Amino acid sequence: ILTPGEEGSNGAVSRAQEMAAQHPEWCFLYQYANDANPRAHFEGTGPEIWRDCPEITHFVAGLGTSGTLMGVGTFLKQQNPDVKIIAVEPPLGERVEGLRNIEDGYIPPVFENWHGRDVLDRKRVVRPRESIEWTRRLVQECGIFAGISSGASLAGAVKVASEINEGTIVFIVCDGGWKYLSTGAYTADLDEAEANAEKIIYF
């Protein structure tokens, strides 16, 4: 089911809500509001990070459904309130696949229900071109076939690293590259890849 590209993920969410209302017999998982989303990261991802990297000083992740940030961020703050929780988002009006700017008219219920503004210490803005550049570096230098929102998270983490004297930064590789093959993100000229990637929103 396709929704108008210019509506971005907001349009897709709205369409899904309409369909769920029309078909109450359907199961609507609604990851933007489903408490199981942040709960999985609060009970799983967060404890795993803390177990393996208790020296963490900064956690950086993309702001999409906000489930990862809310679950991991809440858990880490409970372990050490000094850990900085940083959201990566695209500039208002620009697209980075899988991410959102919470000023664009839709705030995920997960973000509100988990007191997102209290959990986050700050946000870092990452442009589509930066996202693609760092996605390519993940593939070429690390052998990780990551998606563009993962490249955005890495770009945000690099920005954080440039601003501190020392620390331990953890970021999340949250998607695979197979969803982005048609955009040319891995092979095309960078200008062309950026233009193609901005036309499509993936989930």
Summary of predicted features, one role per range:
Residues I1-A20:
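Gly/Ser-rich phosphate-binding catalytic loop and adjacent alpha/beta segment
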Residues L63-G73, S149-A157, Y180:
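Short glycine/serine/threonine-rich phosphate/pyrophosphate-binding segments
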Residues C27-L29, V60, I86, R124, ...:
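Hydrophobic/aromatic beta-strand patches that form the interior of the parallel beta-sheet core
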Residues R51, T74, Q78, V158-S162:
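Short, well-ordered alpha-helices that flank and scaffold nucleotide-derived cofactor binding pockets
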Residues H23-S66, V72, R117, R129-F145:
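Active-site/ligand-binding-proximal alpha/beta "capping" segment
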Residues A33-A36, G64-G67, E89-E94, E103, ...:
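Glycine-rich beta-alpha junction loops
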